[in-house]
Curated annotation (Swiss-Prot):
Keywords: Chemotaxis, Cytoplasm, Hydrolase, Phosphoprotein. The active site is at S199, H227, D323. SMART domains: REC. CDD domains: CheB_Rec, REC_CheB-like. It comes from the Bacteria. Gene3D superfamilies: 3.40.50.2300, Methylesterase CheB, C-terminal domain (3.40.50.180). GO terms for cellular component: cytoplasm. It catalyses: [protein]-L-glutamate 5-O-methyl ester + H2O = L-glutamyl-[protein] + methanol + H(+); L-glutaminyl-[protein] + H2O = L-glutamyl-[protein] + NH4(+). Residues 144-153 have a biased composition (Low complexity). Its EC number is 3.1.1.61, 3.5.1.44. This is Protein-glutamate methylesterase/protein-glutamine glutaminase 1.
Length: 381
């Protein structure tokens, strides 16, 4: 049964739940009802019902299950985005290889993010981690949605929404950093290594950057920290390999870094670089989370700055929070270069915005311009 709620206050983030389990929808609704500034305005059991509900309601964020009768999540996703291109869709997926693969395919198709689905309704009802992650992502994506104009629909002009001022008490850092853009006026050094950090919206940004920067276009190794759990990072490496032709894989502890390869931090491990004789090697550790994340971008960048000095190019892509900003400061202090994705092309301009407004970036670029910028600088080495 489809449920449409009365129109909420205009400053609420409007959420639609799409899941064939009425029990799951009910539990998630109860979680969100206790959060100020969030309201579930529709709750439906399959993709076809979601399309009909989207035509009737103004929605900011959709929580979309993958496996459903009548119309599944992957089939519904492009249809939802066709109706409302600015819609933020969070895929709900199991922590399995199949679930990770489908979630990453969905992000290639335009989904903004994913959330691991608890394995039982008991975990769903009582899981503090699930609630915290869900609410944080809804707030981040809802705010990103409101930061610009809602795309026009047939029969009416576009409607702008106010930026949401309230944040969840569990949200660890500001979603959108304050302050003006501040660019460095330095001459970037050609790099010996390229480091990329990303979070919310990161997989599709990585596919764009690496898909443009095909294997063989640069000789330098590429190291990536994307905020993701184990299993998902395994599949991320496979997807990057397919779209780019690079030899891409999860990093292994102690392996020497080689040019022309892509190394991805495994879920639940920080990835850092150490010097061992004449080699640079990757080390994995379970040191405490930084910026509430493991893997985190900051420890990766700090270690690379220490190992490579000025021959580092760090790129901060879309993501909530400020992970990568302090690590970027270490890169700049060692003479290296930092660039970031611009606000207009970011799903959430938290991480790149923090770097851009901290005065450490040599360039802040639209997503399609990042790979050409990297390739031009890398070719000088």
């Amino acid at each position: 049964m489809a449920i449409d709620s009365p129109s909420p206050a205009t400053d609420s983030i409007r959420v639609m739940l799409v899941d064939d389990s009425a029990v799951v929808r009910g539990l998630v609704t109860r979680i969100l009802e206790g959060e100020a500034g969030i309201q579930v305005v529709a709750s439906v059991g399959n993709g076809q019902m979601a399309l009909a509900s989207l035509e009737r309601n103004e929605i900011d964020v959709v929580i979309l299950d993958i496996e459903m009768p009548v119309m599944d999540g992957l089939t519904a996703l492009p249809k939802l985005l066709q109706i409302d291109p600015g819609l933020k869709v969070i895929m709900q997926s199991t922590l399995t290889l199949k679930g990770a693969d489908v979630s990453l395919r969905a992000m290639q198709m335009g989904a903004a993010d994913y959330i691991p689905k608890p394995t039982s309704t008991r975990d769903l009802a009582g899981g503090v981690d699930f609630k915290s992650e869900l609410v944080t992502k809804i707030r981040a994506l809802g705010q990103a949605r409101r930061a610009g104009a809602r795309p026009a629909r047939p029969g009416g002009p576009p409607a702008t929404r106010p930026v949401i001022a309230s944040t969840s008490p569990r949200t660890p850092v500001p979603i959108h950093p304050p302050g003006p853009l501040q660019l460095r006026s330095n001459t970037p050094e050609p790099p010996d290594i390229i480091a990329i950090g990303s979070s919310t919206g990161g997989p599709q940004a990585l596919f764009t950057v690496l898909g443009t920067m095909k294997a063989g276009t640069v000789r330098q190794p590429i190291v990536i920290t994307q905020h993701m759990p184990a299993t998902f990072t395994t599949i991320l490496a496979e997807h990057i390999g397919r779209v780019s032709g690079w030899e891409a894989r999860e990093a292994q502890d102690g392996e020497a870094i080689r040019g022309g390869r892509v190394y991805i931090a495994p879920g639940d491990f920080h990835m850092v670089v150490e010097t061992k004789g004449t080699d640079k090697v990757l080390r994995l550790n379970k040191n405490p989370p930084e910026n509430f994340c493991r893997p985190a971008v900051d420890p990766m960048l700090r270690s690379i700055a220490a190992a490579y000095g000025k021959r580092v190019l760090a790129c901060i892509l879309t993501g909530m929070g400020a992970d990568g900003m302090k690590g970027g400061q270490a890169v700049v202090a060692s003479g290296g270069t930092v660039i970031a994705q611009d606000e207009a092309s970011s799903v959430v301009w938290g991480m790149p915005g923090a770097a851009a407004t901290a005065g450490i970036c040599s360039a802040v670029l639209p997503l399609p311009e990042i790979a050409p910028w990297i390739m031009k600088l890398a070719a000088r080495r």
